[in-house]
Amino acid sequence: MKKIDKSKPVLVTGANGYVASWLVKQLLDNGITVHAAVRNPSNEKKVAHLKELAINSKGEIKFFKSDLLEKGSYQEAMQGCELVYHTASPFTSNYKDAQKELIEPAQNGTANVLESANQIDSVKRIVVTSSCAAMYTDAIDSVNAPGGVLTEDVWNTTASLDYQPYSYSKTLAEKKAWEMQEQQNRWDLVTINPCLVLGPPLNLKQTTSESLNILKMLGGGDMKMGAPKIGIGIVDVRDVAEAHYKAGFTPEAKGRYITAAHNSDFLEMGTVLLPKYGDKYPLPKKALPKWLLKIVGPMTNKLFTRKFVSNNVNIPWNADNSKIKNELGMSFRSLKETMEDSFQIMIDQGIFK
């Protein structure tokens, strides 16, 4: 059990990221000094929104140049911090070399941050942004889990370098974090394991989250003939930020926390938008048949292999979020609110032509 002093600075790695930006906002609004570690603090396009958040808050922000793969590059930013949030990790399906672009940055980056924590005596707690991907690869894995539901006790055993390497990278990175935590006794570790994160970004034009590509497909007409009923969990980015905040400052917080609000699917993501946006945008109204996806899927998207379609389409995704509700007092936004807020900001920014 660790009580964190709010007068001390708090480090956030990858501070300009999709989730991290909302976390920085919450920290600043609570009057906390944020040490924001980013790759290039002088890139105004990527940090201006964070500076603006600080101006309108009770807290303050200091920027530090840090790189996931550069050893020791977080040590300066970590000085004086009792609490460290490690959110930086790649999330992309547009890779050529999974080992170099996903596995190594995720695993070595986590080790790099935690090794720095071992050198900095002030650190008491590290909150790592992991993922539900460290628990499952495909929706069928949740069906096959004990009781047909994912819990914090479940680890991903089906991903590999060749199949769903993003899930594999998150699994290896989180396992590395727990392994390093067990080798010392000064700082404790909490992991936040979100499912698909949606919701309005604070810096849309610079947000590279894969989640937003799904919204572009929904609103841009890619799914106007129908959507694949891929079972998936959904959570709002603002709720994920709050979960991080509570995981850092709740002394009793411990272990892993599934951060999922809704057991849903791609079709429901579209149909929940129909009442408000259905007249103006080519949103999906029906499910694409599984047999069709098995034929055309591999031709339209490299991730849509026949194996992926078999393991995900028309298969429900179920996770138990009772631990985070009971231990951290989390409640979650409705799917309607999350989807409408996400969609509206993309309309406002002219994403759908």
PLM regions and their residue ranges:
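Active-site Tyr-X1-5-Lys
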Residues: 160-189
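Conserved Rossmann-fold NAD(P)-dependent oxidoreductase catalytic core, especially the SDR/UDP-sugar
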Residues: 90, 96-166, 190
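Mid/C-terminal beta-alpha module of Rossmann-like enzyme folds, strongest
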Residues: 243-306, 326, 335, 339-353
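Alpha-helical substrate-binding/gating segment
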Residues: 215-257, 261-264
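N-terminal Rossmann NAD(P)H-binding glycine-rich loop of SDR-like oxidoreductase domains
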Residues: 3-32
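Glycine-rich "substrate-gating" loop/helix at the edge of Rossmann-like oxidoreductase active sites
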Residues: 162-165, 199-207, 223-238
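NAD(P)H-binding glycine-rich loop region in Rossmannoid oxidoreductase-like domains
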Residues: 41-108
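Glycine/proline-rich active-site loop of Rossmann-fold NAD(P)-dependent oxidoreductases
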Residues: 183-187, 199-214, 247-257
